[in-house]
């Protein structure tokens, strides 16, 4: 699987892990002959984060093609293109590049993720029943979707023919070449498309973790039993500190953080985002505060303010610097990742981290020299627990808009306990 950010790679890998298929996530784009593939040779499913969501379309396409070519040289024969469920990023350019690189003639595309309230009805993305362009999630500081109509959004970045199908019996001639956008409002709808097209057909599937789950279920019927998703209420007498980094500005993540801060031992370390961008916030002082909380056995919650005034200020900083809307966010994510890595390195007993926002998690893992994660459990659908490939650091990654009000609190409750049951495959 090839994804344009880390949380997307992780939640899609989780969809396969939940159905009994060992899964790993690698930080890409991959080199022509990636040694990293050898570190995950036991995995049945490998998801690669190309970190291309905010790159120019042509550059994103080249990175995806290079990654697919590297995977093919490593022996991979089946591919899935992960795209954002709300059409952010370079969906059209990356699907076109991946079609060419993997040698398929047609892509079946459906970004629906019903478990997270994302559906495709009449060719348009809806979020909890609301048209994407009217939903709060459409306001993304890094650049949101250009249209709720999937075909229109893709067509802005590709010249391939794009057809639409509402029902499986409408596929017909459209399956010869190009892109076919299909509707799905439920997991059962997604399963019907998989049953209609089949696992052995020469198509490129492209979608979110929702479609990946349908493919995983069909694959598992042939090969493996499903796993149980973790219940965060699992009792444990063990208490270990957890660092939670809320890098996403999404209102859902902010509500989850507020609920998390009601837990015993949870302490907030808040930094002004504009100050971070301007270099006015001391990274050493913030690291010292975080380490102090962890050494006292508490849960450190590191975040930035997310008011409308803050958003406007960050946008203005980007314009002043001559950059696009996502520039300030990228700098903040890199800074939060650097703080997270420094806290882990300073407090060697720390083994549990939660990150909302893929850029933050990726920055921290790169600082730590970790090539990627293996999936070892789940907090809830779309919210995986990973363990770094080369150490015993447990990492929960979560897309900003995913989960319910208690998701971060549940994640901390689970991670503060004994994680060995997940690591040895009994999750």
Segments from the language model and where they lie:
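Conserved, well-ordered active-site substructure
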Residues: 349-352, 356-410
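Cap/lid and interdomain-hinge subdomains that line or gate substrate/regulatory clefts
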Residues: 22-24, 44, 55-79, 83-197, ...
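N-terminal basic/disordered segments at the start of proteins
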Residues: 1-42, 62, 110-115
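C-terminal structural cap/anchor segments
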Residues: 293, 297-356
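Glycine-rich, highly charged phosphate/nucleotide-binding loops
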Residues: 30-32, 37, 54-69, 332-335
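A structural-propensity feature for long, helix-poor, extended segments
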Residues: 41-51, 295-298, 387-422
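Conserved, well-structured core segments that form the ligand-binding/active-site neighborhood
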Residues: 126-289
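Short acidic, glycine/serine/threonine-rich loops at helix termini
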Residues: 12-14, 90-94, 118-126, 192-196, ...
């Amino acid at each position: 699987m090839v994804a344009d950010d880390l949380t997307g790679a992780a939640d899609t890998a989780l969809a396969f892990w939940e159905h009994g298929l060992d899964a790993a996530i690698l930080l890409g784009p991959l080199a022509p002959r990636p040694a990293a593939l050898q570190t995950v040779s036991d995995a049945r499913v490998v998801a690669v984060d190309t970190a291309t969501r905010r790159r120019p379309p042509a550059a994103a396409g080249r990175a995806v093609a290079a990654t697919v070519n590297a995977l093919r040289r490593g022996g991979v024969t089946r591919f899935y293109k992960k795209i954002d469920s709300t059409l952010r990023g370079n969906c059209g350019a990356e699907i076109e590049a991946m079609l060419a690189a993997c040698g398929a003639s047609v892509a079946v595309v459906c970004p629906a993720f019903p478990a997270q309230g994302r559906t495709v009805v009449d060719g348009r993305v809806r979020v909890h029943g609301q048209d994407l362009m009217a939903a709060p999630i459409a306001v993304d500081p890094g650049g949101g979707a250009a249209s709720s109509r999937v075909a229109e959004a893709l067509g802005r970045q590709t010249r391939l023919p794009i057809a639409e199908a509402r029902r499986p019996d409408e596929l017909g001639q459209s399956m010869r070449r190009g892109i076919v956008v299909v509707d799905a409002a439920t997991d059962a709808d997604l399963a019907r498309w998989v049953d209609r097209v089949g696992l052995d057909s020469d198509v490129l599937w492209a979608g979110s973790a929702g479609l990946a789950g349908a493919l995983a279920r069909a694959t598992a019927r042939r090969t493996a039993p499903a796993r149980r998703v973790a219940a965060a209420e699992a009792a444990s007498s063990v208490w270990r500190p957890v660092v939670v980094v809320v890098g996403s500005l999404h209102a859902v993540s902010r509500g989850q953080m507020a609920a998390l801060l009601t837990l015993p031992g949870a302490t907030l370390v808040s930094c002004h985002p504009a100050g971070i961008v301007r270099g006015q916030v001391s990274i050493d002082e913030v690291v010292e505060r975080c380490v102090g909380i962890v050494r006292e056995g508490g849960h450190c919650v590191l975040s930035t303010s997310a008011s409308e005034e803050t958003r406007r200020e960050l946008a203005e900083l980007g314009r002043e610097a001559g950059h696009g809307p996502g520039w300030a966010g990228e700098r903040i994510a890199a800074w939060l990742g650097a703080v997270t890595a420094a806290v882990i390195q300073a407090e060697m007993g720390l083994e549990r981290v939660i990150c909302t926002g893929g850029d933050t998690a990726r920055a921290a893992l790169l600082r730590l020299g970790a090539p990627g994660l293996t999936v070892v459990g789940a907090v809830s659908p779309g919210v995986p627990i990973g363990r770094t490939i080369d150490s015993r650091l447990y990492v929960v990654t979560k897309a900003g808009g995913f989960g319910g009000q208690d998701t971060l609190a549940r994640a901390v409750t689970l991670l503060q306990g004994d994680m060995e049951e997940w690591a040895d495959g009994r999750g």
